A protein has these predicted regions:
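C-terminal transmembrane helix and the adjacent membrane-cytosol boundary/short C-terminal tail
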Residues: 121-139, 143-146, 150, 154-155, ...
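Cytoplasmic-entry segments and transmembrane alpha-helices of multi-pass inner-membrane transporters
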Residues: 55-89, 139
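Amphipathic cytosolic juxtamembrane alpha-helices at the membrane-cytosol interface
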Residues: 65-70, 143-166
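Interhelical loop and adjacent transmembrane-helix boundary motif
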Residues: 25-28, 183-224, 228, 232
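Membrane-interfacial helix termini and adjacent extracytoplasmic/periplasmic loops
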Residues: 3-21, 28, 85-117, 185-189
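Faces of alpha-helical transmembrane segments in polytopic inner-membrane proteins
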Residues: 51, 74-82, 104-128, 158-166, ...
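Transmembrane alpha-helix signature in integral membrane proteins
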Residues: 28-59, 168
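Transmembrane alpha-helical segments of polytopic membrane transport and secretion proteins
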Residues: 1-17, 64, 229-240
Length: 240
């Protein structure tokens, strides 16, 4: 191994050790970034479940003109580019824009709104799919017993509670690692709108690889936990 390679690997190893130390010793800046990421992404994903589950269930059990068009729109939203969401919200939140009076630009609530928009189609789609996969006789039986539409929605929700958990975890996983919308509407302000993904981009650009790697380690752990929970939900649901 030549001197250049040795120096490279030595610096990389030193940076990794420093990254672990930042996490273990409770570095205030690093843990503030972690906390902000979790607060913003959890709030946005939980909020998306409130309208997303009823809408998804309603679309699945209803028949009306334009239903397929609505489903296609939700499917399009499933792959909505975060940078496009960030661009649209940034324009709306400009000082003289339609929502400029709210003074939300470069604030955590603006990031929550952006992530909510990204989460909502995911929750709607996965809820609709879960309801459609139920035995049709179950819905007919509920209606025959006199269940109202609201009671029907509640009973269907109980039947698909594991897929609903999977829908939430998928939504959370989708936004916790996105960077485009968060950067554009949040501005990456320290102690306020700086989250794991935006911090990684900034710290890498500045050559602060220790903090960038610390944030990267936490982000990988979060994604790993989400993937593990999704796998558990899928396998448990498969053997019900």
């Amino acid at each position: 191994m030549d001197a250049v390679s040795w120096e490279y690997w030595s610096e990389l190893g030193s940076g990794f050790v420093d990254a672990i130390l930042l996490l273990v010793t409770g570095d205030p800046e690093t843990w503030t970034i972690i906390r902000q990421s979790l607060v913003i992404s959890i709030t946005a994903s939980v909020a998306s479940v409130i309208p997303g589950v009823p809408i998804g269930a309603w679309v699945a059990v209803s028949s009306f003109p334009g239903r397929n068009l609505l489903i296609a729109a939700f499917n399009t939203g499933f792959g909505l580019p975060p940078v496009v969401v960030g661009l649209i919200l940034s324009i709306l939140l400009l000082r003289h824009g339609p929502l400029g009076g709210l003074n939300l630009r470069f604030t955590p609530p603006a990031m929550m709104v952006a992530q909510f928009i990204l989460c909502l189609p995911i929750v709607i789609n996965l809820t609709a799919v879960a309801v459609q996969q139920l035995n049709p006789k179950l819905r007919l039986q509920m209606r025959a017993l006199g269940a109202s539409r609201s009671q029907l929605m509640w009973l269907l929700g109980r039947e698909i509670r594991l897929p609903l958990l999977g829908a939430y975890m998928a939504a959370f996983g989708a936004v916790v690692h996105e960077v485009g919308a968060s950067q554009m509407v949040g501005g990456n302000l320290p102690g306020s709108t700086r989250v794991l993904t935006t911090a990684i981009v900034m710290e890498t650009g500045m050559g602060h690889y220790d903090r960038a790697m610390a944030c990267g380690i936490v982000l990988l752990l979060l994604v790993g936990v989400v993937a593990g929970l999704l796998t558990w939900v899928q396998q448990r649901d498969a053997y019900r």
